[in-house]
Amino acid sequence: MKKLTLLVLSFGLFIACSKESGNSSSENLSTTTILETINSIAFEEDIDALVSESMSLGSNVSSARSADSNADKGPKKFKGDKYGDCATVVEDEENNIKTVTFSDDCEGKRGQVRSGSMIITYSETQGETGSFRQVTYDNFYLNGVKIEGIRRTEILSVDDSSKTMLTTVSDGKMIYEDGTFKTRESAMTRYVHFENDKKTYSTLSGSKSGISTEGVEFSMEITTPIKFVYDCFSTGERKRGKVPVEGIKVTTSGDELISTNFGDGTCDTLVEVTKDGEVETLDLKDIKRGERFKNILKRKKK
């Protein structure tokens, strides 16, 4: 049994998921394909947060070197070792490049494990309309999944309370531990709202296309923006991190179509998946890559 990884969107959690071999079905859009589209959104949100924090390193970070006159030029660490004490950032100011390196298997405070490097190139100005940052990867793994491709983010508009950005991914690939891989191309628009200089929520819209690890060609479109809140309460318990609470995405392969609804604003890991009028509620904490839907795909094609 191969161990694979699913990043649960809410609460920044990762869970190990199994994929059974030989579990075939006549349907193209299996649980695996749907989960992998969710997984890629989650990975993108994680990488976006990491890149943003690496770009803002300054007075709120500590130097990885001893305190001397050259310390400010040395590798930097994230505040509170959020991404692990083995995560460092080196900046080449002359060429506008930052390199984020995770030595060995570097475990962050929320359990995410990273290794390898992310190379970030950026425009001379930052935080203004038209400014950009671009990410490439050098043997980079996020919780056992190898990430490849070119990720570019450009600011479309900005004001005192919000920022709108366009992120494109080209030649994207997610390679799982069993050697299977998913390819993707995407263009996503992210809107971030601020209150008192703190992020309160963001929305994500856009589309992507690719081939799943099962060899299924698919396209995915967010038809109702996915809303992420940064601090919310559920059954009296405070949930930290970026939590998806609303939004609908539609995944299509050939003449098959499945929609995924992220909810009505409640902070949980439940999603509703709909195909041909049949609805199934799934808990992202419990489902696994390679499993089949219990209800909506129980009828085989004739």
Where are these regions (language model features)?
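Low-complexity, intrinsically disordered segments exposed to solvent
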Residues: 19-302
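C-terminal motif of bacterial Sec signal peptides marking the signal peptidase cleavage site
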Residues: 15-16
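Repetitive helical segments and hydrophobic/amphipathic motifs
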Residues: 11-12
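Sec-dependent signal peptide recognition
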Residues: 2-8
